C-alpha cells in the first residue's frame, strides 16, 4: 500500500503540473472550439479561421504553460523568464512543446529566483532596476539557449518514445488496461496529475496531428462515476441512497467528479466497478475511433460534448453511457452480494461504511482510527476563519464551504467560511477542513491551523457537530444567551440556552416601511443615517458599514440583509440598536439574481451584543408566513407584534 509520505509527494507533484494547466484551461477550450468548428472536418469548415489552430497550439498554449510554470516557481519575474525559456524549446523543435513547457517554464522561474536570492541585500542603492531588468534578460536568454539546444531535442525524443508506446497500446488493443491504474489513482486524488500532467500533453500532440484525441476522455469520462452513483440510488441504503441523487446531478451535469469518490472509499470493492466502466469507455472509444479536440474541464457531459467534433459524437456518447452501464451493473452485483449482516439495520450506510473504512485504512498504517480530529488544538471561541480546501479549490471544496457557510450564517456565528486550493492556504487561517487523503498536504501549508479531516465534503452531520461546538464555545466565552435559533437540530441544544434580558427595545421609530432604493448602497446609507438619527452610532459608523459590505455581502437569505459596521468601528457605536427598512420591490445585494433583500436591517451593537440583536430578527425565520408579512405589511404594528413574539421565543 502506498505510504502517506509517498502519496503526499505524488499529490504535490501532480498538483504542480495541474497548476500550470488549470489557470489556462480557458485558452485550451478556446483552441478546442476553433478546432472543432473550423478545421476541414469541423462543424462549419472555414479555411481562414482554421489558420488560428496552428499558431495557437505551437506558440500560445505552450507559452501560457511556461509563463504559469515560471510564476509558480519564481513569482512575476519567474513568469517572464519562464516564457522566454519556453520560446527556446518551442523554436528548437517542430512538434507542440507542452511537455517541454512544463519542464523549462519552472526551470526559468527557479533560475531567476535562485539569482535573486543570491544577490539579496548586495545591490547598491539606485542600481536595483538596472540589475533586475538585465538579470531577467540575461538569465532568460541563457535558459532559452539551453532549452533550444538541449531540452527541446531531449523532449522531442521523449515524446517520440511515449508516442511509440501509445501506438503499441493502441495497435495491441491494450489501451483499455490504463483504467486499471487510472481509476484507483483518481480516488487517491491524483486525477489532476493524471489528466493534466500526462494525458493532456499526449492528447494535445495527438490532436494536432489527427484533429482529436482519445486521451482527453480516459480520465474525464463521467460514465464510471455515473454508474456507481446510480447503483447507490437503486441499491444503496440510508444516507448514501438519499444523497446519491443530488451527487449524480452534480457529477454528470456539473462535472465535479470528486463527488463520487467517497461512495467508493466507503465501499472499496466498488473500485472494480469504476475500473470496469473505465475500460469499457476506453474500448468503446477505440472501436469508434472517437475522441475530443481539447481537454474537457470540468468533466461535465456538456463540456465533453462541446469538445467533440461531429464525426465523434456517436462514439463519445456511446463510450459515456456504455461505461455507466457497465459500472452500474458491476456495482449493483457487488452491492447485492453484501452479506445480510452488513445490510440488516443499516439505516445510515454512508456513516457506518465510512467509519469501517477509516478503521481499515488506519489499521494498515499502524495508527488509531482517524476521526474528525485536529492537528493543533485551539480555543473554539477564537475561531474566526474556516477554509474548506481541496486539490483544485473549485469543485468539492466549494460545495462543502457553501454548506458550512449556510449553517454558520443560520446560527449567526461571526465566522467566515471560504474555499480554496490547498497550495493557496494562508498561514493565518484558524481552521482547515479537507478530505482525509489531503490533510497531510494541508498541514504543510497551514501548520498553525486546526485541521479537520472528513471523507465526504457533503457530510452534513460533521458540519452540524462543528457548528454545535462553535456555538457552545462562543456562548460560554461571551456569556451570550441566544444566538440565532438554529434551523439545524445539531446546533439547537437546550444545554446552551440561557435566558437573559434583551439589550434593546424596538420602537415604531426603528421601523420604516414601503421604501424604494436603486441599489444596495442607497439602502445601506439610508439604514446608516437612521442609526445616526436615533442616536445609536456616530456618523463615521456609516462609512464602516460600506467597508463591511466590501468584505462579504451581508445578505443572509430569505430576503433579509443585515448591513453593519466593521469590527474596528465598534468604538463608534453609542448604544445597541437596529433599524428595520422594508423594500417591497427588493434590493439586489449581489450579482446573484437570487440575493434580493426586502428587509434591510441596519445593526449597531457594542462588543458581541450584535448576536443578540440579530436573534430577535432571525427567530422569525422559522415561520415563512412571518417573513412574508414582514416584507409586505404596511402596518408598523404588525412588525412590532411579530418581532416581539420572536424575541420572547
From Swiss-Prot:
GO MF annotations, alphabetized: kinase activity; protein-N(PI)-phosphohistidine-mannitol phosphotransferase system transmembrane transporter activity; protein-phosphocysteine-sugar phosphotransferase activity
Transmembrane region(s): 25-46, 51-71, 135-156, 166-186, 274-293, 314-335
Compartments reported by the entry: Cell inner membrane
Residues modified to Phosphohistidine: 564
Residue ranges annotated for the PTS EIIC type-2 domain, each copy included: 13-342
PTM remark: An intramolecular phosphotransfer takes places between His-564 and Cys-390.
Catalytic activity: D-mannitol(out) + N(pros)-phospho-L-histidyl-[protein] = D-mannitol 1-phosphate(in) + L-histidyl-[protein]
Residues of the PTS EIIB type-2 domain: 384-475
Swiss-Prot/TrEMBL keywords: Cell inner membrane, Cell membrane, Kinase, Membrane, Phosphoprotein, Phosphotransferase system, Sugar transport, Transferase, Transmembrane, Transmembrane helix, Transport
Gene3D superfamilies the UniProt entry points to: 3.40.50.2300, Mannitol-specific EII, Chain A (3.40.930.10)
Domain of life per record: Bacteria
One of the GO biological process terms: phosphoenolpyruvate-dependent sugar phosphotransferase system
Record-annotated PTS EIIA type-2 domain positions: 504-646
EC number: 2.7.1.197
Residues with the Phosphocysteine modification: 390
Membrane topology: Multi-pass membrane protein
Stimuli inducing this protein: Induced by mannitol. Repressed by MltR.
Marked site positions, Stabilizes the transition state in the phosphoryl transfer from HPr to EIIA: 548
Active site: 390 (phosphocysteine intermediate), 564 (tele-phosphohistidine intermediate)
Subunit organization: Homodimer.
Protein role: The phosphoenolpyruvate-dependent sugar phosphotransferase system (sugar PTS), a major carbohydrate active transport system, catalyzes the phosphorylation of incoming sugar substrates concomitantly with their translocation across the cell membrane. This system is involved in D-mannitol transport.
The record's note on its domains: The EIIC type-2 domain forms the PTS system translocation channel and contains the specific substrate-binding site.
Protein name per Swiss-Prot or TrEMBL: PTS system mannitol-specific EIICBA component
Originating species: Vibrio cholerae serotype O1 (strain ATCC 39315 / El Tor Inaba N16961)
Taxonomic classification: Bacteria, Pseudomonadati, Pseudomonadota, Gammaproteobacteria, Vibrionales
Amino acid at each position: 500500500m502506498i505510504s502517506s509520505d509517498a502519496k503526499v509527494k505524488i499529490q504535490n507533484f501532480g498538483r504542480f503540473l495541474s497548476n500550470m494547466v488549470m489557470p489556462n484551461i480557458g485558452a485550451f477550450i478556446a483552441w478546442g472550439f476553433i478546432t472543432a468548428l473550423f478545421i476541414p472536418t469541423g462543424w462549419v469548415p472555414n479555411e481562414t479561421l482554421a489558420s488560428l489552430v496552428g499558431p495557437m497550439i505551437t506558440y500560445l498554449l505552450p507559452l501560457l504553460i511556461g509563463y504559469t510554470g515560471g510564476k509558480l516557481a519564481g513569482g512575476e519575474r519567474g513568469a517572464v523568464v519562464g516564457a522566454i525559456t519556453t520560446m527556446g524549446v518551442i523554436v528548437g523543435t517542430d512538434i507542440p512543446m507542452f511537455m517541454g513547457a512544463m519542464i523549462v517554464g519552472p526551470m526559468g522561474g527557479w533560475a531567476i529566483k535562485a539569482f535573486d536570492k543570491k544577490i539579496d541585500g548586495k545591490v547598491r542603492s539606485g542600481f536595483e532596476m538596472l540589475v533586475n531588468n538585465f538579470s531577467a534578460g540575461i538569465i532568460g536568454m541563457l535558459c532559452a539557449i539551453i532549452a533550444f539546444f538541449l531540452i527541446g531535442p531531449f523532449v522531442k525524443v521523449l515524446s517520440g518514445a511515449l508516442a511509440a508506446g501509445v501506438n503499441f497500446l493502441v495497435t495491441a488493443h491494450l489501451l483499455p488496461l490504463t483504467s486499471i491504474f487510472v481509476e484507483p489513482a483518481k480516488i487517491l486524488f491524483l486525477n489532476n496529475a493524471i489528466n493534466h500532467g500526462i494525458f493532456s500533453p499526449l492528447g494535445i500532440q495527438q490532436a494536432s496531428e489527427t484533429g482529436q484525441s482519445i486521451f482527453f476522455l480516459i480520465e474525464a469520462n463521467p460514465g464510471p462515476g455515473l454508474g456507481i452513483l446510480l447503483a447507490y440510488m437503486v441499491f444503496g441504503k440510508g444516507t448514501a441512497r438519499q444523497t446519491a441523487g443530488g451527487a449524480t446531478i452534480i457529477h454528470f451535469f456539473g462535472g465535479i467528479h470528486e463527488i463520487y469518490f467517497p461512495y467508493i472509499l466507503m465501499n472499496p470493492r466498488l473500485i472494480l466497478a469504476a475500473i470496469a466502466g473505465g475500460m469499457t469507455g476506453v474500448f468503446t472509444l477505440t472501436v469508434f475511433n472517437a475522441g475530443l479536440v481539447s481537454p474537457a474541464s470540468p468533466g461535465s457531459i456538456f463540456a465533453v460534448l462541446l469538445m467533440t467534433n461531429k464525426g465523434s459524437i456517436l462514439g463519445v456518447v456511446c463510450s459515456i453511457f456504455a461505461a455507466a452501464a457497465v459500472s452500474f451493473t458491476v456495482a449493483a452485483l457487488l452491492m447485492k452480494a453484501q452479506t445480510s449482516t452488513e445490510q440488516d439495520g443499516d439505516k445510515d450506510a454512508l456513516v457506518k461504511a465510512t467509519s469501517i473504512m477509516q478503521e481499515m485504512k488506519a489499521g494498515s498504517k499502524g495508527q488509531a482510527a482517524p476521526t474528525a480530529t485536529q492537528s493543533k488544538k485551539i480555543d473554539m471561541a477564537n475561531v474566526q476563519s474556516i477554509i474548506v480546501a481541496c486539490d483544485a479549490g473549485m469543485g468539492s471544496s466549494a460545495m462543502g464551504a457553501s454548506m458550512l457557510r449556510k449553517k454558520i450564517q443560520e446560527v449567526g456565528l461571526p465566522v467566515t467560511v471560504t474555499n480554496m486550493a490547498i497550495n493557496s492556504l494562508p498561514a493565518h487561517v484558524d481552521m482547515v477542513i479537507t478530505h482525509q487523503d489531503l490533510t497531510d498536504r494541508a498541514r504543510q501549508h497551514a501548520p498553525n491551523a486546526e485541521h479537520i479531516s472528513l471523507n465526504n465534503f457533503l457530510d452534513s452531520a460533521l458540519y452540524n457537530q462543528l457548528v454545535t461546538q462553535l456555538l457552545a464555545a462562543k456562548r460560554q466565552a461571551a456569556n451570550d444567551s441566544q444566538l440565532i435559533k438554529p434551523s439545524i437540530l445539531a446546533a439547537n441544544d437546550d444545554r446552551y440556552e440561557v435566558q437573559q434580558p434583551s439589550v434593546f427595545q424596538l420602537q415604531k421609530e426603528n421601523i420604516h416601511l414601503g421604501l424604494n432604493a436603486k441599489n444596495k448602497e442607497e439602502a445601506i446609507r439610508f439604514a446608516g443615517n437612521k442609526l445616526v438619527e436615533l442616536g445609536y452610532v456616530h456618523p463615521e459608523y456609516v462609512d464602516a458599514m460600506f467597508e463591511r459590505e466590501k468584505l462579504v455581502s451581508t445578505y443572509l437569505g430569505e430576503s433579509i440583509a443585515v448591513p453593519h459596521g466593521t469590527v474596528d468601528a465598534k468604538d463608534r457605536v453609542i448604544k445597541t440598536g437596529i433599524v428595520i427598512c422594508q423594500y417591497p420591490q427588493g434590493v439586489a445585494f449581489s450579482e446573484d439574481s437570487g440575493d434580493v433583500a426586502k428587509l434591510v436591517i441596519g445593526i449597531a451593537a457594542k462588543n458581541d451584543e450584535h448576536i443578540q440583536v440579530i436573534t430577535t430578527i432571525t427567530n422569525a425565520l422559522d415561520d415563512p408566513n412571518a417573513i412574508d408579512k414582514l416584507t409586505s405589511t404596511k402596518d408598523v404594528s404588525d412588525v412590532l407584534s411579530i418581532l416581539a413574539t420572536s424575541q420572547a421565543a
